[in-house]
């Protein structure tokens, strides 16, 4: 395997390990093991360092405009083709949990696509986005500017499920 493919595989593995370890940390914390949770969070942070290093070596961290366009392209692919295909397969198999997870992600990726597109338009005018508080739904990932809604329009969770980034 060529070095480029090794870097891509390493980036994917480190990224997945980061997310998995953060989920493990949440579980350890919830079960009353704060030091084990801290260990998982530390390892997750280390995996992020590795993933970012691999991404930089691959030349994938570019200008802000190029990074926004890459995010737009990725989110577009996810909500236009990837998640619809995943939803269809999960429905065919009768996996209701996967259907809900995929539908939530599809809806949120479309929102991210719009947010990134708006940010790129503003950036292309030579400015940063206007200052805003950004909130994320802890259930579905819905991302909103300037305050959490009373009820998430995607998963219908209450306002209390949103956290500020």
Report the location of each language-model feature:
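Non-heme di-metal
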Residues: 1-165
């Amino acid at each position: 395997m060529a070095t480029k493919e090794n870097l891509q595989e390493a980036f994917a593995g480190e990224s997945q390990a980061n997310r998995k370890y953060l989920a493990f940390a949440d579980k350890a914390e919830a079960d009353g093991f704060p030091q084990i949770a801290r260990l998982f969070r530390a390892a997750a942070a280390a995996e992020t360092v590795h993933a970012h290093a691999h991404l930089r070596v691959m030349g994938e961290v570019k200008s802000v405009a190029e990074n926004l366009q890459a995010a737009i392209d990725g989110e577009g692919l996810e909500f236009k083709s990837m998640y619809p295909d995943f939803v269809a397969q999960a429905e065919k198999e009768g996996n209701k949990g996967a259907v809900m997870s995929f539908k939530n992600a599809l809806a949120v990726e479309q929102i991210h696509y719009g947010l990134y597109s708006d940010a790129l338009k503003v950036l292309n005018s030579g400015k940063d986005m206007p200052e805003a508080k950004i909130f994320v739904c802890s259930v579905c990932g819905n991302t909103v500017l300037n305050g959490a809604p009373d009820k998430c329009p995607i998963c219908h969770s209450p306002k209390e499920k949103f956290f500020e980034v």
